[in-house]
């Protein structure tokens, strides 16, 4: 049975079940649909066709009363017709190889988010970041480094935004979404191009890292960092007095984490702390791998035995002795490698002393940090996937500007991911309102950087866009193209600068651009090559060479060679008197005499008449 016949059979079974039950659920419809159908609009069309047959589709199985109200009959012919129609729908969309359609089809499988859904995902992102910050606070030296940077900025009068970007307190209160005028993403108006240029200019001129606020409140930052500093001192005293595993130290470290984790660090600071914790784990892993290779690969110790015996004994120098007590068959090899194993264990002990943590504590802190990162990463992924349609709707406005549509989409996706990182749901705006500007800026910046063969700086792109906009306005006002002088007066710019901008704004043209209807003719065929000689010049040059050779043939061999070397005839370059003298092993004065004698011979009318015609030309 062919694939299409099988699909029709499955769809007939679905319709038969609907006739028998009197209804279908969305889950049943989804289970019987072909796998290639994933676009929500296609699914809605299929459900509408099933409804037209008299079979109602419910979210969940309805009760008996609802079935009585919605009861309807279907016939066999209608079932076959619907199955054939559904199979035809599948065949139309299931075989596309267009990357844009495939991307949109996959994108359509993700449902749009409500305002509540956006807040829920944003809270999960913040929760993941707080878990990472809580784990970082447990690592010695991390909080100290942030406090040192904060104190340095306060002392030097720097910007707080170089350290932190805000706070993520774990409260449930959030402002309601404001009634913001929706962004018009359709390109229907007559002045849409002018609006696009204005938007592009404003997007390019904005700083990519500026969120439009004045940064963190200095007073609130002072209070928070003071509390963190005081709690850090308490934690250090408890650690010194009672040890890390004590109840007192654990309580103080927990309090430190509670104060530190709401601080939202800038990416540079956050990544530096994460890298610091990761570095300690990588050091542990490197020594553990070295010990495992010595035991498993070199000593032929079974891997299962190593994984059973080695954990929790990473720095125990008596571990080798405990392994040898059972006298395994690999005991002799282990004994032979004892010194190498002890050397790596000592490196682990030195690492523990350096970071003031045991190997188990380093692993536990990294595990907690990884869990928080994974939680935030999953939530960000959901937010990005649910807003991919927004990127496409914005990217459509910027087609035919030098970048392919898929490139525009990917650049917009980069802006979308940055918007997810910086989104603050407590401000009350919907995510789409905030993300629109990041997406638009990412797209316009990429067009400015990549669209032109010869890259033009962004500030010059702004000037070109402004010039084009004013030029169109003056064209509508005057009914003709404005002159550079008129543009300069309107833009308050010197005329020479206007001419430079107009020259820069010109797009390069490919030499392979076809000319006319004949595909064999290209623009390069009609452009003069100034480096090539004309046929007449080439013929004259060849005739001059031949005449010169004939004239030189009338001299002695020595005189001819001296002239050839002195004037570079049939050579790459000419030579000085001294260079020619070395060649003939005579003085430069003698070469000058030979040259003068040869030139007198050439000036004789019998010889000079052959070359005089070239001089006249």
Swiss-Prot record:
Keywords in alphabetical order: Cytoplasm, DNA-binding, Sigma factor, Transcription, Transcription regulation
CDD domains xref list: Sigma70_r4 (cd06171)
GO cellular component: cytoplasm
Bias kind Acidic residues: ranges: 196-218
Domain of life: Bacteria
Any single GO BP term: DNA-templated transcription initiation
Cellular localisation: Cytoplasm
Pfam families: Sigma70_ner (PF04546), Sigma70_r1_1 (PF03979), Sigma70_r1_2 (PF00140), Sigma70_r2 (PF04542), Sigma70_r3 (PF04539), Sigma70_r4 (PF04545)
Region of interest: Sigma-70 factor domain-4: 551-604
Region described as Disordered: spans on this chain: 170-220
Organism, as annotated: Pseudomonas aeruginosa (strain ATCC 15692 / DSM 22644 / CIP 104116 / JCM 14847 / LMG 12228 / 1C / PRS 101 / PAO1)
Major localization listed first in the record, in broad terms: cytoplasm
Protein name (record): RNA polymerase sigma factor RpoD
GO molecular function: DNA binding; sigma factor activity
Keyword match Zinc-finger: no
Similarity comment: family membership: Belongs to the sigma-70 factor family. RpoD/SigA subfamily.
Function text: Sigma factors are initiation factors that promote the attachment of RNA polymerase to specific initiation sites and are then released. This sigma factor is the primary sigma factor during exponential growth.
């Amino acid at each position: 049975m062919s694939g299409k016949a099988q699909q029709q059979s499955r769809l007939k079974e679905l319709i038969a079940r609907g006739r028998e039950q009197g209804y279908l659920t969305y889950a049943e419809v989804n289970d019987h649909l072909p796998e290639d159908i994933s676009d929500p609009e296609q699914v809605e069309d299929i459900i509408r066709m099933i409804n037209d047959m008299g079979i109602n589709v419910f979210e969940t199985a309805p009760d008996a009363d609802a079935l009585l109200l919605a009861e309807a009959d279907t016939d066999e012919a209608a079932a076959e017709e619907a199955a054939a129609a559904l199979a035809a729908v599948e065949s139309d969309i299931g075989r596309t190889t267009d990357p844009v359609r495939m991307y949109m089809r996959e994108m359509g499988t993700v449902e749009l988010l409500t305002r509540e859904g956006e807040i829920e995902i944003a809270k999960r992102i913040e929760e993941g970041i707080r878990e990472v910050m809580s784990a970082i606070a447990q690592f010695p030296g991390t909080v100290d480094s942030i406090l040192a940077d904060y104190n340095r900025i306060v002392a030097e009068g720097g910007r707080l935004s170089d350290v932190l970007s805000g706070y993520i307190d774990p409260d449930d209160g959030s402002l309601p979404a404001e009634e913001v005028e929706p962004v018009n993403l359709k390109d229907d108006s007559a002045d849409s191009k002018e609006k696009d240029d204005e938007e592009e200019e404003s997007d390019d001129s904005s700083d990519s890292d500026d969120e439009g606020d004045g940064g963190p409140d200095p007073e609130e930052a002072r209070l928070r960092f003071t509390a963190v500093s005081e709690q850090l001192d308490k934690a250090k005293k408890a650690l010194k007095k009672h040890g890390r595993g004590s109840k007192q130290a654990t309580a103080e470290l927990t309090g430190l984490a509670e104060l530190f984790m709401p601080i939202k660090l800038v990416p540079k600071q956050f990544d530096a702390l994460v890298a610091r914790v990761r570095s300690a784990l990588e050091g542990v892993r490197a020594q553990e791998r070295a010990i495992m290779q010595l035991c498993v690969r070199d000593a032929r110790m079974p891997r299962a035995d190593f994984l059973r015996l080695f954990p929790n004994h990473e720095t125990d120098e008596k571990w080798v002795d405990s392994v040898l007590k059972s006298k395994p068959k690999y005991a002799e090899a282990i004994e032979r490698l004892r010194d190498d194993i002890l050397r790596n264990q000592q490196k682990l002990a030195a690492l523990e002393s350096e970071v003031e943590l045991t190997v188990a504590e380093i692993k536990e802190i990294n595990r907690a940090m990884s869990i928080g990162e994974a939680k935030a990463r999953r939530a960000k992924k959901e937010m990005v996937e649910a807003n991919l349609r927004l990127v496409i709707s914005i990217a459509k406005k910027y087609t035919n500007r030098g970048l392919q549509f898929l490139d525009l989409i990917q650049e917009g996706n980069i802006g979308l991911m940055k918007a997810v990182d910086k989104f603050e749901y407590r401000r009350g705006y919907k995510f789409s309102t905030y993300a629109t500007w990041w997406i638009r800026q990412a797209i316009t910046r990429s067009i400015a950087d990549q669209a032109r063969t010869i890259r033009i700086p962004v500030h010059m792109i702004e000037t070109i866009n402004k010039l084009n906009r004013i030029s169109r306005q003056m064209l509508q006002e005057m009914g003709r193209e404005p002159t550079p002088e008129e543009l300069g007066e309107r833009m308050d710019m010197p005329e020479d600068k206007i001419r430079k901008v107009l020259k820069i704004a010109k797009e390069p043209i490919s030499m392979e651009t076809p000319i006319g209807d004949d595909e064999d003719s290209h623009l390069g065929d009609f452009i003069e090559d100034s480096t090539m000689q004309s046929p007449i010049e080439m013929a004259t040059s060849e005739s001059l060479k031949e005449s010169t050779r004939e004239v030189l043939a009338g001299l002695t061999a020595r005189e001819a060679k001296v002239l050839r070397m002195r004037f570079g005839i049939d050579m790459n370059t000419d030579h000085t008197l001294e260079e020619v003298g070395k060649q003939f092993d005579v003085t430069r004065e003698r070469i000058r005499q030979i040259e003068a004698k040869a030139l007198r011979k050439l000036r004789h009318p019998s010889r000079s008449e052959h070359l005089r015609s070239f001089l006249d030309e």
